[in-house]
């Protein structure tokens, strides 16, 4: 099984008023080339897709275009994206039902009730030729306030 792991893209980040869009686009093209060459079974993106929790429309389009290109480069690959501390978990998940049609699983929040965590959302199968060859346990960035019943001492 081959897994490609990446994180901390920070799309939309500027450095002292220097627009980094060109280098971010170059990174996404390079990532797509790697996926094309390596044909991994899964790609895991572990948070901080965006630098700001409310990214500009152009930044969101850059992400969407990149994920579609990556999917086209390796249509059978399972893609897992988790939210990081810079991402808005709810905004990242907003199109998750649509993304699933492209083999992309977005986990922005930990789904829980007062009694339990919904693990089904977090356990993602990696399939190869219609059979399960592994699993990814997708856990987004967790804030202590998400678990008020935990003893913090």
Segments the model singles out, each with a brief description of its role:
Residues 15-16, 49-67, 83-102, 106-108, ...:
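Metal-dependent catalytic neighborhoods of phosphoester/phosphodiester hydrolases
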Residues 87-153:
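His/Asp/Glu-rich metal-coordinating catalytic cores
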Residues 70-79, 113-115:
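Short, charged helix-to-loop "capping" segments that act as catalytic/coupling loops
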Residues 1-68, 75-76:
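N-terminal active-site segment of His-dependent metallophosphoesterases
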Residues 2, 78-80, 105, 135:
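Proline-centered loop/turn at the N-terminus of a beta-strand
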